[in-house]
């Protein structure tokens, strides 16, 4: 194949991946599995490395990996990014409507209501359909060039579906689930957690290392076209449809309202629904729909006259701190938790709120007995936002940093000067072991069924194990000491433990509990190093040269394997007969090669994860959605909607016994 054909193949792959990015991140309607997508991306990465002359700054591969920047240069906006006037009540919205109609000299005005996403505003510029720059709002006159970081946001296209030269604007945000995930890791690792998703977004988008941005899974909604008349657009509603057509993600909740009463009804509706969303919103943005009307109304120096923010009432309530509990996590981080007088906050009873760390307590001057305002960060996570100091009586107690671990009584301290967390420094702390064991035996790791949270706690409390590797040395006599376990349960647990010795390498890596190493990273490491021994000997440079492994992850891997306790755990796993190497691809059968499966329901002989691994090991593919390209729907007990879809499309349906016959014959 000559270079011209390779160039054509690269272009074709880019277009295909961009299409799947759009289906997944914009439409939320993927048509291929994650595995298929990863294969396409991997192939493109390999071809671009082999033929660097075909490099493109807008290739989908620019969304993985990262660059380290010196800083962010300031750039003037093409037109100012203005702020909005705002209101919190219905009467002022009605006054806004009357003012608009009076200025325009009309009796009726249509409005577009958009969710006011609490994130970071961004201006995106494209030339001939190619991404050029991304600017933050800054002071509204000039912003910072955040292009390298914005390239890592999967919902923002690097190439449009049309070859347009255009500037659009929107909001970058961190979904609540990503915010929760980051803060959980931050607290475990002794890092300062973010107060809310908006701060998390701002802190992420200004990272000098764009590989960190890629890992934090920011998202976007685009809502504004600069100079819309160039593209024949006459209304904001048309502009939103146009933005989606050319490849941008727009918010599905936007609503066209024919009068102000519709606006108020929608505001009331979203006031109730806002806590059900996976992103933080603090109100609606009400815009005059007609662009000609917008031009007539104009702007003040601060804000457009044709738009207003209709804010939601604050989700907060008053409570009192009754006590402080100290929780110990997997890495020993001690997290203070406020025990509160129960309060009803947005329909749920709140009795506790995390205080994150002792620096946070000092900064907010929080004391036992204080009356405080409690708010739901992102509409979900209870947190104390302020102390009502005027209600202090003088009987409040200052919260002291513990001098010893609340669980084991061991020494506490910081493992580095930079971190804010206080940790239990005892390597044998039972609470640390309990939290690690929960990960170790989980489905995503060694998948040892029968060892639920309560049984794990009893095993640790009975001192039957000193570390996670000891699970492979348990005997029937050991387990007989655990209340609630009969002979049948003991036999089942021991059978599952024996079976777990052949766990795939990537799941072994997950089970080790290396900070910041999840399933995707574990698979990358397993494919690259093939064994725990090779991974444990990897250098920082070797790790950071791997696509998808950033500096933070590399540092954690090296620190983890340098630890003497880790070395002991690895030795014990090896001596117990746990497989610490990856099977070579040559062992793969091609029995199911070229066949695509979808799985639904529950199985007697396998877990769904095991079924997936069997199919892939035999050369088949597993996807999440039934389509005309699906060869088989494998059905267990209580199948879901996929069963009906397969019937409609005429996809062959097989049960567990038929599947067993297929893989054995």
UniProtKB/Swiss-Prot annotation:
One GO BP annotation of this record = DNA replication
The Enzyme Commission number assigned here is 6.5.1.2
Q: What Pfam families would the database entry show?
A: BRCT, DNA_ligase_aden, DNA_ligase_OB, DNA_ligase_ZBD, HHH_2, HHH_5, Nlig-Ia
Q: Which UniProt keywords apply?
A: DNA damage, DNA repair, DNA replication, Ligase, Magnesium, Manganese, Metal-binding, NAD, Zinc
Give the enzyme's main class according to its UniProt record, as a single word. Answer: ligase
The BRCT domain covers 587-665
Q: Which InterPro entries match?
A: BRCT_dom (IPR001357), BRCT_dom_sf (IPR036420), DisA/LigA_HHH (IPR041663), DNA_ligase (IPR001679), DNA_ligase_AS (IPR018239), DNA_ligase_CS (IPR033136), DNAligase_adenylation (IPR013839), DNAligase_N (IPR013840)
What chemistry does it catalyse, as a reaction equation? NAD(+) + (deoxyribonucleotide)n-3'-hydroxyl + 5'-phospho-(deoxyribonucleotide)m = (deoxyribonucleotide)n+m + AMP + beta-nicotinamide D-nucleotide
Residues annotated as catalytic: 116 (n6-amp-lysine intermediate)
Which residues take part in binding NAD(+)? 34-38, 83-84, 114, 137, 171, 287, 311
What role is this protein assigned? Answer: DNA ligase that catalyzes the formation of phosphodiester linkages between 5'-phosphoryl and 3'-hydroxyl groups in double-stranded DNA using NAD as a coenzyme and as the energy source for the reaction. It is essential for DNA replication and repair of damaged DNA.
Q: What is this protein called?
A: DNA ligase
Q: Which gene encodes it?
A: ligA
